[in-house]
């Protein structure tokens, strides 16, 4: 996590396309690359990976 709110907003206020993985702006309604409407917010905590 970021140490101060401005940095956290800059890092995490993005959408990720669930089809192609592109990063999109916070106000986006569809993906800028593929046009898919399934966008999710960027994850604030890491997903389970190598250590789990």
From Swiss-Prot:
Keyword Ribosomal protein: yes
Lineage: superkingdom: Archaea
SMART domains the record matches: Ribosomal_L40e
GO molecular function terms noted in the UniProt entry: structural constituent of ribosome
Coiled-coil ranges per UniProt: none
SUPFAM superfamilies associated with the record: Zn-binding ribosomal proteins (SSF57829)
GO CC annotations, alphabetized: ribonucleoprotein complex; ribosome
Gene Ontology biological-process entries: translation
Keywords: Ribonucleoprotein, Ribosomal protein
Record's signal peptide: none
Family, as annotated: Belongs to the eukaryotic ribosomal protein eL40 family.
NCBIfam families recorded: PRK04136.1
Official protein name in the record: Large ribosomal subunit protein eL40
